[in-house]
Amino acid sequence: MRTYLDLLQHVLDHGVDRDDRTGTGTRSAFGYQMRFDLEEGFPVLTTKKLHLRSIIHELLWFLKGDTNIAYLKENGVTIWDEWADENGDLGPVYGYQWRSWPAPDGRHIDQIANLLKMLHTNPQSRRLIVSAWNPALVDEMALPPCHCLFQFYVANGRLSCQLYQRSADIFLGVPFNIASYALLTMMIAQVTGLKPGEFIHTLGDAHIYSNHFEQARLQLTRTPKKLPVMHINPDVKDLFAFRFEDFRLDGYEADPTIKAPIAV
């Protein structure tokens, strides 16, 4: 994925060194966009191997509306461990906002169910939006949403998705986010009778942590390989019925993982 490597290079070359919440320090650029045509292959990094199991299970966890890490732990996924409390709870994070956004009148709004309904009844709508950024509850979240708003767009029978990510940890987080939202787009396309279109990833504060510079430069020495193909069980017609076993990635050849510390 040359597109991703171009982002790494851009921030290393043109970013501004800044302090940050974690005390680690970053090199950051504000405002950047990447586009991935999902017909050209599944956009997962080939210049370092990603843990696809974590990506899929996290997405299924979001779609369940779950905010406790028990499901993730049961499936060997540890990416949320650092932020959970002693009971495994994270507060009203992504899954809660996606599936149970609290309204002032006491109702809870299932944004994903509403999105699916609109895609069936009014696919030309400009309101095909899901937001995880709830100002009233941000302070109760273990980690406020980094990928905070996404919008869908239907044209010529193809479903495209644009994600706005306010805070983008380029080396560790962004590769997961690309694959996760590409997969979500493919899943929603299948259950709404559409074909996958583009995934557009718009970044706000796009940063590389100072203790990731060496790893980023190593990754830039590697040559991207052909993208793999994601196969989704065609029998699944209900977005909330997908299981891990319904996904198969064929042809994924990647360079070895590059370890880097997480900034908490």
Curated annotation (Swiss-Prot):
Annotated positions binding (6R)-5,10-methylene-5,6,7,8-tetrahydrofolate: H51, D169, A263
Binding annotation for dUMP: R21, R126, R127, R166, S167, A168, D169, N177, H207, I208, Y209
GO biological process assignments: dTMP biosynthetic process; dTTP biosynthetic process; methylation
Listed SUPFAM superfamilies: Thymidylate synthase/dCMP hydroxymethylase
Subcellular localization: Cytoplasm
Catalytic activity: dUMP + (6R)-5,10-methylene-5,6,7,8-tetrahydrofolate = 7,8-dihydrofolate + dTMP
Predominant cellular place of this UniProt entry's protein: cytoplasm
Keywords: Cytoplasm, Methyltransferase, Nucleotide biosynthesis, Transferase
Homology family: Belongs to the thymidylate synthase family. Bacterial-type ThyA subfamily.
UniProt-annotated catalytic positions: C146
Pathway(s) where this gene product acts: Pyrimidine metabolism; dTTP biosynthesis
Entry-linked HAMAP family: Thymidy_synth_bact
InterPro entries: Thymidate_synth/dCMP_Mease, Thymidate_synth/dCMP_Mease_dom, Thymidate_synth/dCMP_Mease_sf, Thymidylate_synthase, Thymidylate_synthase_AS
Keyword hit for Methyltransferase: yes
Top EC class for this record: transferase
GO CC term, one of those recorded: cytosol
Enzyme Commission number(s) of this protein: 2.1.1.45
GTP-binding listed as a keyword: no
Function description: Catalyzes the reductive methylation of 2'-deoxyuridine-5'-monophosphate (dUMP) to 2'-deoxythymidine-5'-monophosphate (dTMP) while utilizing 5,10-methylenetetrahydrofolate (mTHF) as the methyl donor and reductant in the reaction, yielding dihydrofolate (DHF) as a by-product. This enzymatic reaction provides an intracellular de novo source of dTMP, an essential precursor for DNA biosynthesis.
MF GO annotations: thymidylate synthase activity
Protein name: Thymidylate synthase
